[in-house]
Design a protein with these regions (language model features):
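Non-catalytic nucleic-acid substrate-recognition regions in nucleic-acid-modifying enzymes
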Residues: 1-2
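Non-catalytic substrate-recognition/targeting regions of SAM-dependent transferases
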Residues: 6-75, 82
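Conserved class I S-adenosyl-L-methionine
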Residues: 92-103
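Conserved SAM-binding loop of SAM-dependent methyltransferases across substrates and taxa
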Residues: 104-116
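Conserved SAM-binding motif I beta-strand of class I
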Residues: 117-122
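S-adenosyl-L-methionine
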Residues: 126-145
């Protein structure tokens, strides 16, 4: 994620490993899943910061490895951010977005950056706080509706 690499095995990834194992072994951190649920991160790079930022196009996000192998972002959603950002930019009218189960705000940030008014909703106060941080990091979106 960004300049750092994280190894996060997933039980849903049932296909064979196609990449060079040497590359996987260079990961800065490795998530080990527990058979009883959850798991823990093993930090192989002792200089790995607790939190860092990554960029996708003109968007910047805070990343922090958490339990259950979460990092604060679902990068596979970037294709969706691109899609609706273009729709928002091409609209001939103001766009209002209701982002439910919004997590740390990847979609919220993308929609705001595209010019939409966004209501961000998540049940976790911590995730809403993180989303607010993502909204204001490296951009002037904090005063947008």
């Amino acid at each position: 994620m960004g300049r750092l690499s994280l190894r996060r095995p997933d039980p849903q990834a049932v296909w064979s490993l196609k990449s060079d194992k040497k590359l996987w072994n260079k990961a800065d951190a490795w998530y080990h899943r527990s058979k009883s649920g959850g798991g823990k991160w093993e930090y192989l790079n002792k200089k790995l910061p607790e939190r860092w930022t990554i960029n996708y196009r003109n968007l910047t996000f805070n990343i922090k490895p958490m339990g259950f192998k979460h990092t604060g972002l679902f990068p596979e959603q970037a294709v969706n951010w691109d899609w609706f950002s273009e729709l928002i930019k091409k609209a001939d009218r103001p766009i209002r977005v209701l982002n439910l189960f919004a997590y740390t705000g990847g979609a919220t940030v993308a929609a705001l950056e595209a010019g939409a008014e966004v209501v961000h909703v998540d049940a976790s106060k911590g995730m809403v706080t993180w989303a607010k941080e993502n909204v204001v990091i490296d951009r002037d979106l904090g005063d947008r509706p």
